[in-house]
């Protein structure tokens, strides 16, 4: 393979796309976790003044939101592991790593937003009707799975570049 053909498949800007995917995975998934934590935390602090004994049971949305940032961290570590200053980095790998980061990032952002909305209203209604707890947890699980789907797609995409 000639140098000009190698430069065509591994241009100098290709690693930028990989770094952008790494950053997008962390930034967007942590933003989703922060939104979910903030929105559900507002509801928890609201019920804490009336029924402090319900605070520990109401922390489930906050914990579920925190897990979203772990999804972004896992994908970011995998992307960073594929970046090397001594090896050629193809344009395909750059776009693939960008797609990995955006996939998990936007999925976790949407998941965090939905966890925040359900968590906020759920804990407020749980204060009035404790029988709603199981239904709220099920809805939170379905909202959490959205972020997991993004991570699964990112992992599948990442294996395409290493295989």
Swiss-Prot record:
Residues 1-15, 80-97, 157-163 are lumenal. The keyword Membrane applies. Pfam families: ATP-synt_C (PF00137). One of its GO terms (molecular function) is proton-transporting ATPase activity, rotational mechanism. Coiled coil: none annotated. It is found in: Vacuole membrane. GO terms for cellular component: fungal-type vacuole; vacuolar proton-transporting V-type ATPase, V0 domain. The keyword Transferase does not apply. Residues 37-58, 119-135 are cytoplasmic. It is a multi-pass membrane protein. Its main location: membrane. The record marks 144 as: Essential for proton translocation. The chain crosses the membrane at residues 16-36, 59-79, 98-118, 136-156. Keywords: Hydrogen ion transport, Ion transport, Membrane, Transmembrane, Transmembrane helix, Transport, Vacuole. V-ATPase is a heteromultimeric enzyme composed of a peripheral catalytic V1 complex (components A to H) attached to an integral membrane V0 proton pore complex (components: a, c, c', c'', d, e, f and VOA1). The decameric c-ring forms the proton-conducting pore, and is composed of eight proteolipid subunits c, one subunit c' and one subunit c''. Proton-conducting pore forming subunit of the V0 complex of vacuolar(H+)-ATPase (V-ATPase), a multisubunit enzyme composed of a peripheral complex (V1) that hydrolyzes ATP and a membrane integral complex (V0) that translocates protons. V-ATPase is responsible for acidifying and maintaining the pH of intracellular compartments. Belongs to the V-ATPase proteolipid subunit family. This is V-type proton ATPase subunit c'. The lineage of its organism: Eukaryota, Fungi, Dikarya, Ascomycota, Saccharomycotina.
């Amino acid at each position: 393979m000639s140098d000009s053909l190698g430069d065509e498949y591994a241009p100098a800007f290709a690693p930028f796309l990989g770094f952008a995917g790494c950053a997008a995975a962390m930034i967007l998934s942590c933003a989703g976790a922060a939104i979910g934590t903030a929105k559900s935390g507002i509801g928890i602090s609201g019920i804490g003044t009336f029924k402090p004994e319900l605070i520990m049971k109401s922390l489930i949305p906050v914990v579920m939101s925190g897990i979203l940032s772990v999804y972004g961290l896992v994908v970011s570590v995998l992307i960073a592991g594929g970046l090397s200053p001594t090896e050629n980095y193809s344009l395909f790998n750059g776009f693939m790593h960008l797609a990995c980061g955006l996939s998990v990032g936007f999925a976790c952002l949407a998941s965090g937003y939905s966890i925040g909305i359900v968590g906020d209203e759920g804990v407020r209604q749980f204060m009035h009707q404790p029988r709603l707890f199981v239904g709220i947890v099920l809805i939170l699980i379905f909202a959490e799975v959205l972020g997991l789907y993004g991570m699964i797609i990112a992992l599948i995409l990442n294996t395409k570049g290493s295989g």
